[in-house]
Design a protein with these regions (language model features):
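Pre-Walker A adenine-sensing motif
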Residues: 1-14
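Hydrophobic anchor at the beta1->P-loop junction of P-loop NTPases
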Residues: 22
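Conserved lysine of the Walker
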Residues: 30
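Hydrophobic positions on the alpha1 helix immediately C-terminal to the Walker A/P-loop
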Residues: 33
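Short glycine-rich substrate-engagement loop in P-loop NTPases that contacts/grips substrate
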Residues: 45-75
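Conserved catalytic/switch belt of AAA+ P-loop NTPases
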Residues: 88-110, 114, 124
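Interdomain motor-coupling "hinge/lid" segment immediately C-terminal to the ATP-binding subdomain
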Residues: 105-106, 113-115, 119-219, 245-246
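Accessory nucleic acid-recognition modules appended to NTPase machines
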Residues: 172-336
């Protein structure tokens, strides 16, 4: 079993909050993680699991107050909780009643296939009672530490992406088929269930265009012209994909600057395996020969780093009108500012524009991540750090913050 890096943090939150929500796309492993967590509890306190998409489980909540009262001594896991928005008001009443009786934590674990913003529309009544944890697809630090297969494992993770069934498939072809079915299911079943009436083919076309333009600045007008819709419609569609944790808008650096800065966000399909499935890339050789290879690599590196960073880290990119650019800025809690340049080459070089950009923002650390697994200094105070090592540094900072 793969050890998810948020497990310890999740256990801590359950000791501190009455309810904890694990958010993430479908099939990312939320249910497996929840069962893994419940298995750590004693047999007498074993968790109860209800899938709100299952009619028999849903029937057990026909009188939720009675059900929760009958199982007041158990952790109750509620899967796909966004399907029953009226439940949040009930949970608030139960939590407040138990709090008055001296029970303050570890009562409910909520699993949802939507972002904090989307779920918050239904869960405002749980303010101060609910902690959020996002579960992302597998990242590099979660793979078994096997030096003999480390390179092949990393290549497979980049190609197939981190959804467990895609990464662990018996072959690249089987993985591609799973991802293509995943995309179809989201478009034809899951998104319509959330309410928006969006033509599946239109959304598929947009998603595919975003994959082609991985790591590029968003040009909504051009996308709108290609699809025959308005720029506002493109914005709404991308909002939805972001809410479903499938796409990321990486915002530009927002501090005051004397330079003329690019203001458009960069857009990434968050899972590299979905990028490749949308483009029909099933093998590592096909990926390396495709024009998207650079953008795919950049997006994969950025998602791994953001997933490992401490809470409250602000992620952005920096680009001036004359081309001085930093691929990823990580503003850490406490104010440190890491400027990360992503390179595909194993013998990376950086442009003068990167140095200018680092001076502009006052970067406290200048970093290059490439395909090389060696750590070495570069000219101009730059550190080349392998992805795995940099992720571990960020995780150490994250764990220190959580333990405080």
């Amino acid at each position: 079993m793969y050890q998810r890096q948020i497990l310890e943090e999740l256990s801590l939150y359950l000791q501190e909050f009455p309810a904890v929500a694990i958010l993430g796309p479908r099939q990312v492993g939320k249910t497996t993680l929840a069962h893994q967590l419940s298995a750590q509890q004693s047999a007498a306190q074993g968790a109860l699991y209800l899938d709100l998409e299952s009619p028999p489980d849903l029937a057990q909540l026909s009188d939720p107050n009675a059900y929760f009262a009958a199982h007041a001594d158990r952790l109750v896991i509620l899967d796909e909780v966004q399907r029953m928005p009226g439940l949040f008001a009930v949970l608030r009443g139960v939590i407040d009643q138990r709090r008055r009786a001296g029970v303050a934590s570890g009562q409910f674990l909520l699993l949802g296939s939507a972002s904090i913003e989307l779920l918050a529309q239904s869960s405002e009544s749980l303010a101060g009672r609910l902690a959020y944890v996002e579960l992302v697809p597998f990242v590099l630090t979660e793979l078994p530490a096997n030096p003999a297969s480390r390179l092949a494992d990393a290549q497979s993770l980049w190609l197939r992406g981190g959804f467990p069934q895609a990464y662990l498939a018996r072959s690249d072809a089987a993985s591609l088929r799973w991802r293509q079915q995943f995309i179809t299911t989201y478009l034809e079943r899951d998104i319509p269930l959330l309410g928006p009436r969006i033509p599946a083919q239109t959304l598929r076309s947009l998603w595919t265009m975003l994959a082609y333009e991985q790591a590029q600045m968003l040009n909504a007008a051009r996308l709108a012209a290609s699809l025959g819709v308005s720029g506002q419609t493109i914005g709404r569609y991308i909002d939805l994909l972001c809410d479903l944790l499938l796409v990321r808008r990486l915002q530009p650096w927002a501090r005051q600057s004397s330079k003329r800065l690019v203001k458009a966000p960069k857009v990434y399909v968050r899972d590299s395996g979905l990028v490749h499935a949308l483009l029909g890339l099933g093998t590592y050789a096909e990926l390396l020969s495709h024009p998207v290879v650079g953008g795919s690599w950049e997006g994969w590196i950025i998602e791994n780093l953001i997933a490992s960073a401490p809470h409250q880290t602000q992620a952005s990119y920096y680009r001036t009108a004359v081309g001085a650019e930093i691929d990823l800025l990580l503003e850490l809690p406490g104010g440190a500012l890491w400027a990360v340049e992503v390179k595909r080459s194993s013998a990376p070089t950086v442009s003068r524009g990167y140095h200018i950009a680092c001076d502009d923002v006052g970067a406290t650390r200048r970093l290059v991540v490439s395909s090389s697994d060696a750590r070495f200094p570069m000219a101009g105070g730059i550190e080349h750090v392998p992805l795995l090592e940099l992720m571990r540094e960020l995780l150490a900072l994250h764990q220190t913050n959580v333990a405080r």
